[in-house]
């Protein structure tokens, strides 16, 4: 097994710093899935979708160099388990750097070596090297690391402005622990919370629905009908506060009374966060 990658350019370096920071804020331990065309972050363990979980893919276009050899020709992948904060801390040291290199090494034990090339104000180059301990996962547990295979959602809608959404959810989190998220195929979305003493509702309209949201919809379905899911407010707020990328596309997908999925896309990065219904 071999893996080596290099990131250069301010934009790509900042993107990787933000991605690793997002993963660290949402998971203590993660699985790094190295594929021929991408680097994927997933949750450790086999919890399924019974708890909030994050998957993130960084495609090959974000790297100047990307080379890997998997465990075999038929199984051309590598799965590494590591502490997410260790990778985030190493990536943060690349702020203002000229490059960041990732390499699978074996220094007494398997490690993910992160080498950062820095240039001082006097033009002198220096390297900072982080050796992060990893556990190479056996093939028998790979299936637990895959993102879920799901049918088309019952509703898919574009998210409102991030700061507005985060502010609303933060206020609701101070009132109660559960939030009801509703959306339809006509661009409307509602967030609501209700306790014995207070009821709060926030309405959004004209958000827009992605084109694929209409695929497979029965002809007789009322596009104004709302699909809903009640989720843990703290988990939703954790994602809204924790994610650090600047998405060009932000979607909310709902499986009625079953699952909430938030999808963010920025250039060569896609991020999915799943929150199960209560």
Swiss-Prot record:
One of its GO terms (cellular component) is site of double-strand break. Expressed strongly in testis, less in spleen, thymus, prostate, colon and leukocytes. It comes from the Eukaryota. Pfam families: Hus1. InterPro entries: Cell_cycle_HUS1, Hus1/Mec3. One of its GO terms (biological process) is meiotic DNA integrity checkpoint signaling. Belongs to the HUS1 family. Interacts with RAD1 and RAD9B. This is Checkpoint protein HUS1B. The gene is HUS1B.
